[in-house]
């Protein structure tokens, strides 16, 4: 028996490696995906005043920092029984949408596109964003513009483009001025067009690689996502499980997550393996993120994105189970995010100064959930009577996907090593 070790994994938001164990015939026998960095944020926040935590947890991820900021402050609001004003909720949602635009553009164009635009057999020295700029400069310019637009939204609403600070218990610390709104709104229509161009691009690229898409990393799993009245939603928090055959849907609220999600400790990893409790481990492992979201929802929230979702399911089937279809799904979500940004920017509430409710620290337990760029993100805090965090649990989006990524790598390895 031998081993193939891939370390480090490149173009990854974090640190990891893959170990493929081969049998006596040189065929894959076992695959393990190792997340090699100990993070420890669940312990970092214990003993801290809860109002400090939304400024600490964005450091979990330099790309998804806004999602952590908002899941955190939503958890504190829930723990203290706070109902925030509607304009504050819309501001938070706009901030979150800005992060989705930035991250989805970065994820596809900077991390995934080099393999598709330049081809998987291209020299690794040029198979990167610089190579994309050289081969497809117009595509690269649109990608950069989308990222810039998303970051401008986060900066205007969140106070900073990286690690925003304006989400506070009870609402928002900063209103959006009319001038800031108008500055963002003038670019909204163009960004929708750029996002649509992204979907058309991935459809063209998929045609070249459809054999690989439909044979590598194809696995049947459960799916978990966020919906609001059955519609795809980035921010509001009804969670929905979908069965592998697409026939069973189970919905639950954030505060019920421990009744539905278990975490299995594996000895070779710094992350636990989440699973659907009703089914058990490992049969109940599930996927989150764009592919899962398009499967889980009944329809998209915005019209253009819904047209693209219907087309997506015609191509890949329902539920779509191809791991390489994540890129297509992500670009459909990018269209929805740009459409949603325009809707929120045109809402009169978005420049309201009614953005803060009074709060009093107290003992409580609260759960905050958002759909982060990589999938469902859960923050759960318990506070004492002084508002100090005494216990914290976080299930980060990528953590949900680790066991199913492992399964997908194993399936792909078996196909490649035939």
UniProtKB/Swiss-Prot annotation:
Q: One MF term from GO for this chain?
A: nickel cation binding
Keyword Oxidoreductase belongs to the record:
yes
Q: What class of enzyme is it?
A: oxidoreductase
This protein's cofactor list reads: Ni(2+)
* Mitochondrion in keyword set: no
Q: Mind telling me which InterPro entries this protein's record contains? A: Ni-dep_hyd_lsu (IPR001501), Ni-dep_hyd_lsu_Ni_BS (IPR018194), NiFe-Hase_large (IPR029014), NiFe/NiFeSe_hydrogenase_LSU (IPR053511)
Enzyme Commission identifier(s): 1.12.99.-
Keywords (alphabetical) are: Metal-binding, Nickel, Oxidoreductase
Q: Which SUPFAM superfamilies match?
A: HydB/Nqo4-like
According to the UniProt entry, the coiled-coil residues are: none
In which residues is Ni(2+) bound? 61, 64
| Superkingdom to which the source organism belongs | Archaea
The chain's disulfide connectivity reads none
Q: Subunit composition? A: The F420-non-reducing hydrogenase vhu is composed of four subunits; VhuA, VhuD, VhuG and VhuU.
Q: Which family does it belong to?
A: Belongs to the [NiFe]/[NiFeSe] hydrogenase large subunit family.
Q: What else is known?
A: The large subunit of Vhu is split into VhuA and VhuU. Each contributes two ligands to the [NiFeSe] center.
Protein name, as recorded: F420-non-reducing hydrogenase vhu subunit A
* Source species of the chain: Methanocaldococcus jannaschii (strain ATCC 43067 / DSM 2661 / JAL-1 / JCM 10045 / NBRC 100440) (Methanococcus jannaschii)
Gene for this chain: vhuA
């Amino acid at each position: 028996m031998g081993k193939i070790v891939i370390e480090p994994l490149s173009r990854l938001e974090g640190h990891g490696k893959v170990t493929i164990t081969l049998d006596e015939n040189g065929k894959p026998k076992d695959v393990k995906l190792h997340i090699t960095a100990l993070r420890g944020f669940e312990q970092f926040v214990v003993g801290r005043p809860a109002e400090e935590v939304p400024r600490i947890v964005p450091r979990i991820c330099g790309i998804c920092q806004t999602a952590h900021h908002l899941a955190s402050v939503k958890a504190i609001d829930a723990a203290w029984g706070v109902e925030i004003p509607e304009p504050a909720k819309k501001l938070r949602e706009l901030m979150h949408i800005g992060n989705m635009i930035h991250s989805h553009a970065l994820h596809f164009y900077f991390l995934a596109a080099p393999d598709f635009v330049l081809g998987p057999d291209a020299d690794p020295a040029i198979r990167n964003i610089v190579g994309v700029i050289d081969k497809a400069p117009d595509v690269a310019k649109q990608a950069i513009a989308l990222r810039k637009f998303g970051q401008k939204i986060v900066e205007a609403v969140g106070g900073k483009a990286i690690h925003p600070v304006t989400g506070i218990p009870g609402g928002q610390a900063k209103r959006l001025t009319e001038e800031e709104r108008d500055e963002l709104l003038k670019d909204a229509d163009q960004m929708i067009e750029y996002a649509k161009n992204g979907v058309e691009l991935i459809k063209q690229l998929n045609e070249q690689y459809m054999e690989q898409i439909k044979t590598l990393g194809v696995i049947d799993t459960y799916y978990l996502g966020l919906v609001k009245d059955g519609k795809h939603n980035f921010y509001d928090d009804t969670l929905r499980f979908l069965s592998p055959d697409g026939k069973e849907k189970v919905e639950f609220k954030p505060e019920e997550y421990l009744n539905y999600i278990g975490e299995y400790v594996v000895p070779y990893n710094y992350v636990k393996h989440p699973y659907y409790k009703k089914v058990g481990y490992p049969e109940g492992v599930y996927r989150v993120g764009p592919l899962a979201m398009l499967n889980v929802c009944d329809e998209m929230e915005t019209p253009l994105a819904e047209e693209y979702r219907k087309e997506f399911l015609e191509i890949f089937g329902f539920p779509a189970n191809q791991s390489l279809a994540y890129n297509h799904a992500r670009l459909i979500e990018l269209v929805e995010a740009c459409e949603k940004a325009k809707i929120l920017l045109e809402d009169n509430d978005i420049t309201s100064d009614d953005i803060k409710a009074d709060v009093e620290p107290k003992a409580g337990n609260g759960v905050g959930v958002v759909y982060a760029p990589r999938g469902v993100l859960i923050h759960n805090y318990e506070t004492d009577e002084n508002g100090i965090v005494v216990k914290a649990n976080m299930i980060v989006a990528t953590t949900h996907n680790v066991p199913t990524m492992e399964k997908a790598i194993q399936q792909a390895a078996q196909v490649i090593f035939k």
